[in-house]
């Protein structure tokens, strides 16, 4: 499975709504389920890729250089897109600055999504350091304040909801 080419074009539009369509993957294949940058990869494993929307956030949906944001987020509709049940998965593909990655995810949640039934965040890093108190506190804050558990792994995450 290879990554899609949907995000190679420039996204225009003033409002988030105008930018949303151009920031959403239009692939009609399983490429919709994967993102990859600089050797870091996230794969969403679901039975029907048509129930997934992949949205590029950084440089597409949100272009403001001063605003922190994660790289991608996925909407997954486990009961089909006609149902009101949707899950949001925030993905940051990062080198080794985990604190910065967490801050980007939190900023994206605050900016975009407040009332999603299930949220989960993922950081795929080149090197995940030993857990320290700062990282643990940020993870706990994310879980408590946004009800959003966080998974951090090196190089690749394959997630099956």
Regions found by a protein language model. Give the residues of each.
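Active-site metal-binding core of divalent-cation-utilizing nuclease and nuclease-like domains
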Residues: 32-80, 100
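Active-site-adjacent loop/helix micro-motif of nuclease/hydrolase catalytic cores
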Residues: 62-65, 83-84, 97-105, 131-134
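An active-site-proximal "capping" alpha-helix that borders the catalytic cofactor pocket
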Residues: 108
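Glycine-rich, often proline-containing surface loops adjacent to acidic residues and nearby aromatics
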Residues: 84-90, 119-122
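Charge-rich, low-complexity N-terminal segments
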Residues: 1-51
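Conserved catalytic cores of phosphodiester-cleaving nucleases, focusing on short active-site segments
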Residues: 72-74, 87-95
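Arginine/glycine-rich "motif VI" loop of SF2 helicases in the C-terminal RecA-like domain
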Residues: 111-118, 144
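Domain-level recognition of nuclease-like catalytic cores that cleave nucleotide substrates
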Residues: 2-9, 14, 60-62, 122-161
């Amino acid at each position: 499975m290879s990554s899609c080419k949907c995000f190679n074009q420039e996204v225009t539009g003033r409002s988030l709504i105008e930018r949303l369509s151009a920031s959403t993957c239009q692939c009609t294949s399983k490429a919709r389920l994967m993102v990859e940058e600089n050797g870091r990869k996230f794969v969403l494993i679901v039975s029907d890729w048509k129930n997934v929307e992949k949205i590029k956030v950084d440089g597409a949906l949100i272009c403001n250089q001063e605003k922190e944001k994660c790289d991608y987020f996925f909407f997954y509709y486990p009961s089909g897109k006609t149902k009101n049940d949707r899950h949001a998965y925030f993905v940051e593909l990062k080198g080794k600055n985990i604190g910065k990655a967490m801050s980007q995810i939190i900023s994206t949640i605050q900016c975009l999504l407040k009332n999603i039934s299930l949220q989960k965040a993922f950081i795929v890093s080149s090197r995940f350091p030993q857990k320290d108190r700062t990282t643990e506190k940020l993870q706990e804050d994310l879980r408590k304040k946004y009800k959003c558990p966080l998974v951090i792994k090196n190089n690749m995450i394959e997630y099956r909801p």
